[in-house]
Amino acid sequence: MRRQLGIELENQGFDEDWVVVDTTLLDPDLSLSSLVTQYCDPDRIVTYIPGHGTHRRWEFQFLEGETRAEMASPERIAELLGPWGSPDQLQVDRIAVYRFHAVVAERFRVGDVFLAGDAGHQMPPFNGQGMCSGMRDVENLIWKLAAVAAGHADERLLDSYHDERRRHVAGQVEHAVDAGRLINAIAEGGADSFEAGYGGGREFPHLETGLRCGNHRLTGHPFPQPLLEDGGFDRQLGDGIALVTTASTDISADVMDRWAAIDARRVDTRADLFPNLVGD
């Protein structure tokens, strides 16, 4: 669909082949880390991801000259898993060879067509933001589509989808590339890109265009998600649109009626819960 619409991809030039191996832990006495681990081994870079229950995943970087058929063979997989466990300790459930890319579509909307997820962007997996970014796309878009369909907003609202999502996800792709280059640099015995890979000097992505109101220093920044006694604050907000205020904030009935028309909920908080939001 993207090609049919003539939308080009901006390529950041970071492509690598990896093989993913999903396993089931058969030996409960096998000593494996409970933490996600990135092995910057000069012989081969490996990612280890402990999953739910007995699920364990390894991801192995291709070396120069290795083929997809070779890397997906049961014999090679057993060899790759050897440092962590034997076939009678780890049951191989799935083998997948893939090549990741670092690309972002130039446009996220053409007429009534909107790009989301992999159609609009792809990134290296090192920061775990691929699926998260796709979910942000959809969360950003669905309420706007619903508002336009219900007659609560003009269709121009939909143009904000590109404005808000493209810059944000382009920054996520760039950060993932920096993280990947850091991993490669450490494996090669250097760490020139250490600061960039860890996000040093990088401002957390926020909205500079799109739907913005007011000139407060935090306008457009992601909303904080503090932990409360009974769980995360996002659970208290629930689904849909929330108007978060302090209990002392005076909002006219007319304004509240307009919020209610789009099924928004008002959530009152203590001023000390978000001091940075209400301090000035």
PLM features per residue range, with description:
Residues 1-191:
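Core Rossmann-like FAD-binding/catalytic domain of the broad FAD-dependent monooxygenase superfamily
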